[in-house]
């Protein structure tokens, strides 16, 4: 059966999210990382010391998903946590192994970016990225 044009925004956006996730996770291949884990590494590389809550907010995932994602990257030795000013707070940084993994995978990730742009066209891809950010920002704001 071919892909259906769904009547609601939620279903349509989930179709796009699944298709994009498949494209990016193919390039991650045997690394063992999923797209959300790679994204978490990217964010921690740019902003070390984020709390679990801050990371969740930065990438637009719920607290439970962020906790699970960070536990997996910690288990893989890619990030480590320490107690923040509040004993319940965890602050996260990449380990040297995490930094190496990120550098190793970055060319593959960029290849996925190029493949995405090639399939959609650069202008359409950039427009979709902008519209996605605007929608997420507006829908997630209180």
Predicted regions and their residues:
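Short, locally clustered residues in the helix-turn-helix/winged-helix DNA-binding domain
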Residues: 14-17, 42-46, 106
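C-terminal regulatory/oligomerization modules of transcriptional regulators
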Residues: 1, 5, 107, 122-142
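Alpha-helical DNA-recognition elements
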Residues: 26, 72, 134
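Short capping segments at the starts of secondary-structure elements
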Residues: 47-51
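Residues within helix-turn-helix
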Residues: 52-53, 64, 90
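Short alpha-helical elements of helix-turn-helix
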Residues: 7-11, 31-42, 67
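Charged, amphipathic alpha-helical coiled-coil/dimerization segments
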Residues: 21, 71-130
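N-terminal leader segment of winged-helix/HTH proteins
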Residues: 1-31, 100
């Amino acid at each position: 059966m071919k892909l259906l044009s769904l009547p609601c925004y939620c279903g349509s956006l989930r179709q796009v999210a699944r298709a994009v996730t498949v494209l990016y996770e193919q390039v991650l291949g045997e690394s063992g990382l999923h797209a959300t884990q790679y994204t978490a590494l990217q964010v921690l590389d740019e902003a070390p010391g984020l709390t679990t809550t801050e990371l969740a907010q930065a990438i637009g995932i719920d607290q439970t998903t962020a906790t699970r994602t960070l536990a997996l990257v910690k288990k893989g030795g890619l990030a480590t946590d320490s107690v923040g000013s509040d004993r319940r707070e965890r602050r996260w940084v990449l380990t040297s192994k995490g930094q190496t993994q990120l550098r190793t995978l970055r060319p593959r990730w960029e290849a996925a970016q190029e493949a995405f742009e090639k399939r959609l066209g650069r202008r359409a891809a950039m427009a979709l990225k902008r519209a996605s950010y605007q929608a997420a920002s507006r829908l997630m704001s209180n």
